[in-house]
Amino acid sequence: MKGYVVCVYKDITNEEKLKEYAVKARIAVEKYKGKFLIRGGKATANEGESSPRTVVIEFPSYDEANLFYKSKEYQEAHEILKGHAIRPVSYTHLTLPTIQPV
């Protein structure tokens, strides 16, 4: 089952640090066979607060997403961004909806 890392930024205070982080984070994403599905772009909040940036990365499995996040490569990238962005990061697995007969 595929795994996903989801990051919805609440605030970005240093765009240069974000760019530096992105370069290093990409190395870890590629190492763990991740694929960016959403990275930035225009967004509209229909409910709740709007976000300046959203990122969704798909991995071959939940375990691979977990390994990516805990990897030395990603943690080095994460250190660059500390104090320069507020963002919850979570990882999840794909669950197919159960369709109930009518």
How should these model regions be labeled?
Residues 86-88:
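Short, mixed-charge low-complexity intrinsically disordered segments
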Residues 75-82:
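C-terminal structural segments of small proteins and small subunits
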Residues 92-98:
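Conserved small/polar residues in nucleotide/adenosyl-binding loops
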